[in-house]
Structures are given as structure tokens and as C-alpha cells.
Amino acid sequence: LGELKHLHYLHAALHESMRLYPPVQFDSKFAKHDDVLPDGTFVKRGSRVTYHPYAMGRMERIWGADSLEFKPERWIRDGEFKQERAYKYPVYQGGVRVCLGKEMSLVEMASVALCLIRRFDVSVVNHSQLRFAPGLTATVSGGVHATVRRRDLSQ
């Protein structure tokens, strides 16, 4: 486990994947009190407030001119993985509503990715743009077609 935290590029690639393809495309909460959003919008107590991590992960205003590009390097500063603020990168939500399984999911993703990378060569067959299928959690419409070959680990 301790070794996983030193795999900076792996963490950057996982976060970049979830920036573009978050596991939950949109979510909503109910306002506990009357409030005013930073842009001046009044939110009445009990109102549903919906946010869209899928759209936020692609916003040029938030991520820059290359917001639609898969670019793990955007997470690396001074050679190390640096996490963004929860409200810029809302995949795990933030504040008191932060996902309880966040750390466990990151360890699981890194572990599975390492096992797959070590044991298999994976090539995407069709490099067309992935399309989300509507639903509570993220699925790709039509799936992702890939060729998987076992690596020769005897070398």
C-alpha cells in the first residue's frame, strides 16, 4: 500500500480518466438553509440543487483550453501528483459530503490497474469517441472493444 502513493503518473492517469468519465454523471442535493451562490443566485431552503461532474470535467473555464484532451500531466507538479480542490474536481464531492469510500476506491483502482498493466497488453480496437449511456452510474454506450493479450512474464 505504501508503494502505491509513489506512483504519481498512475494516480494522475486515474484522476484524469475520472475527470472526463466520472462514475456519477450528475448529482443533486437539497438546500438546508436559504443561501446565495457565488454568482448571486438565491437558493431557497428545500430547493434541489443539481451539479454535473461530467460537464464540469470538460469546462474550458475550469480546466483550460485543453479541457477535452486526456492529459494526466495536468495533475503533476514538480514531479508529483497533486490533487485538485474538491469543488474543482467534484468526482468524490467535498466538505462534509465527501465520499466515504474515496480512499478505498483510489487504492482499489490503482491496484487493479497495476495488475492489468503488468500482466496484459490491452489495445482499444475502435478509437472512436466514447459515449456515456444515461443512468445512475457511468456506463459506456456499446461498451469499449479491446484486444487483451497475456504478457510473457518469464523474461
UniProtKB/Swiss-Prot annotation:
Domain of life: Eukaryota
Record-linked Gene3D superfamilies: Cytochrome P450
Presence of the UniProt keyword Iron in the record: yes
Cofactor: heme
Induction cue: Down-regulated in response to mixed metal ion contamination (cadmium, copper, lead and zinc), but not in response to zinc ion contamination.
Family in the record: Belongs to the cytochrome P450 family.
Listed name of the protein: Cytochrome P450
